[in-house]
A protein has these predicted regions:
Chain B
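Helix-loop-helix "hairpin" substructures at the membrane interface of multi-pass membrane proteins
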Residues: 103-111, 117-122, 174-248
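Cytosolic-side transmembrane-helix boundaries in multi-pass membrane proteins
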Residues: 1-32, 214-221, 291-333
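Transmembrane alpha-helical segments in multi-pass inner-membrane proteins
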Residues: 234, 244, 248-310
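Membrane-interfacial amphipathic/re-entrant helices at transmembrane-helix boundaries
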Residues: 1-60, 96-106, 332-333
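Single transmembrane alpha-helix segments in multi-pass membrane proteins
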Residues: 26-30, 42-95, 124-131, 264, ...
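Transmembrane helix-bundle core of multi-pass membrane transporters
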Residues: 3, 129, 133-195, 222-225, ...
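Alpha-helical transmembrane segments within multi-pass membrane transporters and channels
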Residues: 96-141, 283-284
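Inter-helical junctions in multi-pass inner-membrane proteins, predominant
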Residues: 35-48, 148-151, 171-173, 193-199, ...
């Protein structure tokens, strides 16, 4: 790195919300042409810091400098006018509008009488799209684009001004590997033009691949900046969580029982075809593949949320028909869903009520629900899973991601399932809770549960599974035992490169 | 519009196809069932139909914009009545009478101002408190109606001005004054929604409010403008209607919000905002009025119209959902 | 510590603000005019609120389940007209169950559309508002409905009778409120209604039959409407076709005033009862103060907005909306 004067400098930023000090004196500097990673667990203050920088929050203390000039970011435009642009994690596009209107959202070129200058709008848009080398045009409706292309629209939006600093917030969350390559090319291009990039991500491989420096936040305070070339994953993790993390792949092996779940030639429309596999009692089977490979859809079909177009599901050797989640639950199948907040929890309800929801109909004395029976279940899993909450009356929405996930897991363990399906068990969960949940999954298998883990994170799949099913584009490409699997052949299988397909 | 693809064409064509079916049905059925000898498709009859569409129509056009925004306005009927009361009452004031013909534009101005102010109150509350527009306007629907009753008790407010009546009954190129108002408002709003920054921002906000906020669109003032606009249009509707009738009951305009919303939904505007078209709403308005007149024409009880419109509204919703289904693969939630 | 108690206070106000407001309101009016808390006056207010109140109980279920019901007003007109008509045709003992049956069919139809067909409840019930109004007019031929022999029937007990001095409408309202309150807060069905309204997708993922629960909330709502229609018919023994017109919004106002969120998942029967009583006592209090009858509308408007505003302001921690 050449030591140039920073293009962007945050100095001692403090932001307090009622009851919380979200940012406690954070400083950061961004040099021209560098990719600067911003890391931290969820709730560490990354988003708040970026909102302050973007003019969506006003800091209580601290200063922001663009070059040598101090700037007060009082509204979103101010940031943009100063060449600081954001590419948000959650796509913020208007589906019904055209690509051009989205790119120039909030600053459509005007003619007299408040009319839109369509000609200028399309010319300007085409110029930007040319630079990105994309396969759609300015007039396409954004709702008709793929997720990756929508992300490109977001990036194009950043290029409407000649940016000095671009902030990417978890940009690869929903991208395929080939789409990531395109994204990294764009970042490299920005870098070569002397633009500074702030890159927020949880994914270590990416961070080490493309960034120059890494700054870490923890609990709203600044923990230091490392040169990427001079550090490693463990050091960064330690900085993030304040302790060492055991990421070893060695797991305790235990006895396995009979086949609990068998799936034969299961298909569901265009989502997945001809999928067969078995899960034994005491076994963890990992499903690994890219987003859209059909893993979640298989889980949902087994749980009765989708109607299979062909194939059989067998439980303990008996063929079963599952038409609804009620059927699945009655037969001893549980699903911890992918989207914790959207599918797993009723956020406005308290912890206990969430946990007892699937069996509330049975927890009755006479016609009424039994407080005692409900609290007993909560207490049991509260202790067993080490859920940190002030009490069962706490609203679930107020818990951290990790504790929320434990509530969902507790909810399904309390049903004593034969087969437990866990979809993306640690998505959006901080590193500390992650390993707790991994250990928990291993413990459950040891207790004799048949477990399916669906995950997009390779280390996770490698860490928890006894067997790994690799999927690509709705098909099972290959099954691996722990001995067979390497990162390399796993990646090949899920990219559709594997030759030896196991049906 | 810059991008019209096929599904858009189907969506925007549906209401006109529906109108064509209505016309055909009532013309044919009318031959057998009609209580009079008049033909349904009689041009004079159709022109009258357009005129009768105007009061709800002008409001429905404004409602389209508010609904594209992702809001709703339930207070339009009350604003309509309040503006009408101001219009007719102000013409009776002593100093106004001394102005002669000039009292007309002034009372119009006062009535329109009333609408704008009441709309602005709604808009300001939505903007500043962050309370959902449904609740805000549900409240003001009661509140504004209360104001109407407090103004003159349960008595009708009347003032007949023959110059006005002549104006309202005049026809230009065959169309009634009210029809002209409806068409001009539709044209202007169509231009606003398709050609201006304000209109495009309305779609953006309804489509993805957070994105609009992030992009620096000032959502609050934008809402305020649109509530003022629909207040203005409710008042304009009252001005057009009561210039001719000359007498307003404090209960007038009740359920107008429901009729207007029905017309907008029939026209295909999304309830969640972000999608809709002024022209299709005009189609929705005409379709409803056609149904009213048509049912009368074939000798059915005028009251049946409520039943039929209610069921058609539900049927449209059902069809829309069936068209948007993804088939068997869909998640069962 | 000061911060905690302040947060505790605003949290308390957010949760129980409506009850505090109700108490303050009653005290102020009682001081302004002692007749306000006269037992006859209070009983009169509750009695005249009972019909609205009974309907609000049913709508509370629908709203907590995450939907709206704008059809209750015209449905109430329907049940009133039907029971009055049948009274003379088949006698009150058969007319009442027949009317309940017909009203429940309407509720089941709406429940089917919203629950099983998953259509938007605002539009469905808006359509049904209009459709049921048309149905009522067709049924009655547009005529007012009257019982021929108003003196020779026991039918008036539901609206005019009393037991040990307590008017029967009040008794019916109270019993129904108590019963439905228990159903909502103490049974598995009640819990499922909260879950479906709070997060319908999560409820389905927890094995709760969302469609059936939504269906049942509309059935309960129509049951309450039938009850209200019975009380209305029995009170007046004759009725116009439009007797319930506009009530849907007053009912909704009471439910919202009670603190139920239109997004679903929150609210209680007890708070709805408070909401109903507030509306009733405002009307009464303003009349006693000599204000015009219609001033209550304006005051109700202000109170609804304030109630909802303060509720969300407490949740977001600031008075004004953050939208620019």
């Amino acid at each position: 790195m050449t030591d140039q004067s920073p293009i962007l400098r945050l100095e001692n930023i403090v932001k307090a919300f009622p009851g919380v000090r979200a940012l406690d004196g954070v400083s950061l500097d961004l040099r021209p042409g560098e990719v600067h990673a911003l890391m931290g667990e969820n709730g560490a203050g990354k988003s708040t810091l970026m909102k302050v920088l973007g003019g969506l929050h006003q800091p209580n203390e601290g200063k922001i400098y663009i070059g040598e000039k101090q700037v007060v970011m009082d509204r979103p435009q101010t940031a943009k006018q100063n060449g600081v642009v954001f590419i948000h994690q959650e796509l913020s596009l208007a589906d019904e509008l055209s690509v051009a209107e989205n790119i120039f959202l909030g600053e459509l070129p005007r003619k007299s009488l408040g009319r839109v200058d369509w000609e200028k709008l399309y010319t300007d848009t085409d110029a930007i799209l040319d630079r990105l080398n994309v396969g759609f045009n300015a007039r396409t409706r954004v709702g008709d684009l793929s997720i990756a292309n929508q992300q490109m629209v977001e990036i194009a939006r950043a290029l409407t001004v000649d940016p000095r600093a671009v902030i990417f917030d978890e940009p690869t969350a929903s991208l395929t590997d080939s789409e990531k390559v395109v994204l990294f090319d764009v970042i490299a291009d920005l870098q070569s033009r002397g633009v500074g990039v702030i890159y927020i991500s949880h994914r270590m491989e990416e961070i080490f691949k493309i960034t120059d420096r890494i700054s870490v936040l923890r609990d709203g305070s600044y923990r230091g900046t490392l040169n990427t070339a001079e550090t490693n994953e463990e050091d960064v993790t330690q900085l993030m969580i304040g302790r060492k993390l055991d990421l070893s792949r060695n797991k305790v092996q235990h006895e396995m029982g009979d086949v609990a779940l068998e799936v034969r030639n299961l298909s569901c429309g265009k989502l997945f075809h001809d999928v067969s596999f078995t899960v034994r009692k005491g076994e963890v089977v990992g499903f690994y593949g890219l987003v859209g490979a059909g893993r979640t859809e298989i889980a949902e079909t087994i749980f009765g949320l989708r109607e299979p177009s062909a194939g059989k599901i067998l439980l303990d050797g008996q063929e079963v028909t599952i038409n609804s989640p009620q059927d699945a639950i009655a037969r001893g199948i549980s699903l911890v869903p992918e989207d914790r907040k959207g599918q797993g929890l009723v956020l406005g309800m308290n912890c206990r009520d969430n946990m007892t929801l699937p069996q509330i109909g049975e927890l009755t004395s006479g016609p009424f629900t039994s407080d005692k029976a409900e609290v007993a279940i909560f207490d049991k899993y509260h202790d067993a899973l080490d859920i940190r909450t002030p009490g069962w009356r706490q609203t679930v929405g107020n818990l951290s991601g990790g504790n929320q996930q434990k509530i969902v897991i507790g909810k399904w363990l309390s049903m004593h399932p034969k087969v437990l399906i866990v979809d993306e068990p640690t998505r959006g969960i901080d590193v500390g809770s992650k390993s707790e949940i991994h250990n928990l999954i291993r413990d459950l298998a040891a207790q004799g549960y048949a477990v399916i883990v669906v995950s997009s994170e390779m280390p996770e799949v490698l860490h928890v599974s006894d067997r790994i099913v690799a999927m690509f584009s709705g098909r099972v490409m290959r099954e691996f035992t722990t001995e067979e699997v390497t990162e390399n052949n796993l990646v090949q299988a899920i990219s559709g490169l594997s030759e030896d397909r196991v049906a | 519009m810059s991008n019209i693809n096929r599904t858009d064409l189907i969506k925007q064509g549906a209401i006109w196809a529906f109108i064509a079916v209505e016309l055909a049905f009532f013309s044919i059925a009318g031959k057998f069932l009609s209580v009079t000898d008049a033909t349904f498709m009689d041009p004079e009859n159709m022109l009258l139909l357009l005129k009768q569409s105007a009061p709800i129509g002008i409001i429905a056009l404004g409602m389209t914009i508010v609904m594209i925004n992702g809001n709703i306005d339930l207070s339009v009927g009350a604003i309509f009545a309040m503006s009408a009361v101001i219009l007719l009452d102000s013409m009776g004031w002593a100093w106004m009478q001394s102005l002669g013909v000039w009292s007309i534009p002034i009372s119009w101005g006062l009535a329109l101002l009333t609408g704008v102010v009441l709309g602005a109150i709604n808009g300001l509350i939505v903007w500043k408190t962050g309370v959902d527009a449904f609740i805000v306007t549900l409240g003001s629907m009661l509140g504004y109606r209360g104001l109407v009753f407090m103004y003159n008790g349960e008595q009708p407010t009347s003032h007949l001005n023959w110059t006005l009546v002549d104006f309202a009954e005049a026809r230009f190129l065959g169309l009634h004054t009210a029809t002209w108002f409806l068409l001009v408002v539709a044209l202007i709003l169509w231009l606003v929604m398709t050609r201006t920054v304000h209109g495009r921002n309305a779609y953006a906000i309804g489509n993805n409010r957070e994105a609009a906020v992030n992009a620096g669109i000032r959502v609050g003032p934008h809402f305020l403008w649109n509530f003022m606009l629909i207040g203005f249009l409710s008042a304009l509707s009252a001005v057009v209607f009561y210039s001719e009738s000359g007498s307003v009951n404090p209960n007038d305009g009740m359920l107008y919000e429901l009729w207007a919303i029905t017309a907008v939904v029939l026209g295909g505007t999304k309830l969640t905002g972000g999608y809709g078209s002024i022209i299709s709403t005009l189609g929705g308005v005409i379709a409803i009025q056609l149904l009213r007149k048509g049912l009368g024409h074939i000798g059915s009880d005028t009251e049946t119209v409520n039943l039929v419109i209610g069921l058609i509204l539900i049927a449209v919703l059902f069809l829309d959902r069936q068209l948007n289904r993804k088939g068997k693969e869909e998640l069962r939630v | 510590m000061a911060e905690i108690s302040k947060a505790g206070l605003s949290g308390f106000l957010a949760r129980q603000g409506i009850i505090v407001a109700f108490a303050v309101f009653m005290i102020v009016f009682a001081i302004a005019n002692p007749r306000f808390i006269d037992i006859d006056n209070i009983s009169g207010v509750i009695r005249s609120s009972a019909i609205l109140g009974v309907m609000a109980l049913g709508v509370t279920f629908v709203v907590i389940g995450g939907n709206l019901d704008l059809s209750v007003g015209s449905m109430m007109s329907f049940s009133t007209i039907v029971v009055l008509d049948l009274h003379d045709k088949i006698g009150p003992a058969l007319a009442i169950p027949a009317m309940f049956g017909m009203t429940l069919c309407l509720g089941a139809f709406i429940g089917f559309l919203v629950g099983y067909l998953k259509l938007n409840s605002l539009i469905v019930t808006l359509g049904m508002l209009s459709a049921i109004h048309g149905l009522t007019l067709t049924y009655s031929g547009g005529q007012n409905m009257d019982i021929a022999d108003k003196r020779g029937t026991w039918f008036n007990v539901f609206g005019q009778g009393d037991i040990i001095g307590i008017p029967i409408p009040i008794l019916m309202f109270a019993l129904l409120a108590a019963g439905l309150g228990v159903v909502l807060s103490r049974t598995a069905f009640g819990r499922k209604v909260y879950a479906v309204g709070g997060n319908g997708t999560a409820a389905v993922f927890s094995g709760i039959p969302r469609a059936r629960i939504v269906f049942l909330t509309y059935l309960m709502s129509s049951f309450c409407v039938a009850m209200a229609g019975l009380m209305q018919a029995s009170r007046s023994l004759g009725s116009q076709n439009t007797v319930g017109q506009g009530l849907e919004l007053e009912v909704l106002a009471a439910v919202i005033l009670g603190g139920a969120s239109l997004l679903g998942g929150s609210g209680t029967i007890f708070k709805t009862v408070i909401g109903v009583l507030i509306l009733g006592f405002i009307q009464n209090g303003l009349l006693l103060m000599g204000l015009a009858f219609y001033a209550q509308y304006v005051v109700t408007w202000v109170i609804i907005i304030l109630a909802v505003w303060l509720d969300i302001a407490a949740k977001r921690g600031r008075l004004l909306s953050p939208i620019a």
